[in-house]
């Protein structure tokens, strides 16, 4: 092949003409000190709060403290190779994580990188972890239910799509169990779930993943794992990363449910980072902005209107509202709900489910305290039939707890009080429910109907659970049409009432338990 010198010179001239020698304006700084994952940098003049900083070895950090002559940053990930004198660069970007359908069924870390050994995640979409929550005009009121499948919650403290409902209690009271049951019950409803595990043992997270897989719920769930062995910075950003993944679905007119398990450990991680950054400590040694830490996270859980979704998707999705429902978990110490972080989160959320150690140890599981648990906005979202039938249950339980305490001292009780006590005993038994056994709306309605209409009055309190099991088996085998009808509409009228009464009369006449 003959090379023509003129062709070569022409090619070189063309390349020189098209070469762009624009200088890249990137501020560089120097690592002054490094300890406990906190880096002090000198020379980064125009760095922004929350900006990503690039270190050698493809490692990134987050600028948190902007001081007069230095910048305090936390390193995200391993920092053993970083040393004093190393160069650090501004990136001009804030931290973003991968989002999208590709993450469903996967376990990722706080940066959205796969940690489940199933290979890289195939998504090109990213979203910043910090976002401003939708404003008042962009929101819509909460009026659609999130069914957890737990009688005690759906009847007494209903949760609506776009609500923030706190699950609070001491350690080992079944907080995670309630959250996992809620995820399992979303199977087939189209609600996408995100489970954010902060500061937990890797074995506990693996157990949750296994349980979700066994019940076919992993395929609609993203698990964000920031284990106890990871740095405080990774634990601190995990809930924000999970929230960004949930917002992807909300902003596209879908419904998502996010569980933060738990925000106490996130507050501990943030306290650790703040103290290492030499920020002044306040109450319980937390920094001054620990309320803002949780409020800016939980305000992002909302129900957005159809105009917002249409605008966000550039008209691709029309007439659909989106929602992100949050179930934050807070762990209390010896039932003290008046500590700093619990009171903060109670004031931010739209209600709380209070789990009690004494009830849990007495075998009442889920161990929900009916008197202290409340849902401030869920009532408007509750299914009609459950709202109608469940109204008396909460009252019966609250009265029963009061009377039970009083009756220990009184020997002769009048007939009315004795009846209330007997009914309360049976309703308490009825509210018991095993883990991984969520109930449909119709099944729940039958249980509540049986309690309200006196079908349990002649059943021994110890046999109530057996009665319910036998009743549900009978309904599932011979009354499938009625169950389907109730599940489809959720209405409560004379026709439905007559059908339920006839079904229960038939069951009591022909079956034993």
UniProtKB/Swiss-Prot annotation:
Site (Required for activity): 373
Record text on subunit structure and interactions: F-type ATPases have 2 components, CF(1) - the catalytic core - and CF(0) - the membrane proton channel. CF(1) has five subunits: alpha(3), beta(3), gamma(1), delta(1), epsilon(1). CF(0) has three main subunits: a(1), b(2) and c(9-12). The alpha and beta chains form an alternating ring which encloses part of the gamma chain. CF(1) is attached to CF(0) by a central stalk formed by the gamma and epsilon chains, while a peripheral stalk is formed by the delta and b chains.
Name of the molecule in the record: ATP synthase subunit alpha
Mode of membrane association: Peripheral membrane protein
Recorded GO CC terms: plasma membrane; proton-transporting ATP synthase complex
HAMAP family: ATP_synth_alpha_bact
Function: Produces ATP from ADP in the presence of a proton gradient across the membrane. The alpha chain is a regulatory subunit.
Annotated transmembrane regions: none
Keywords recorded for this protein, A-Z: ATP synthesis, ATP-binding, Cell inner membrane, Cell membrane, CF(1), Hydrogen ion transport, Ion transport, Membrane, Nucleotide-binding, Translocase, Transport
Subcellular location: Cell inner membrane
Single Gene Ontology MF annotation: ATP binding
Family of the protein in this entry: Belongs to the ATPase alpha/beta chains family.
Record's keyword annotation contains rRNA-binding: no
Chain sites annotated for binding ATP: 169-176
Organism (species): Thioalkalivibrio sulfidiphilus (strain HL-EbGR7)
UniProt cross-references to Gene3D superfamilies, sorted A to Z: 2.40.30.20, ATP synthase alpha/beta chain, C-terminal domain (1.20.150.20), P-loop containing nucleotide triphosphate hydrolases (3.40.50.300)
Enzyme Commission designation: 7.1.2.2
Catalysed reactions listed for this entry: ATP + H2O + 4 H(+)(in) = ADP + phosphate + 5 H(+)(out)
Keyword Ubl conjugation on entry: no
PROSITE patterns: ATPASE_ALPHA_BETA
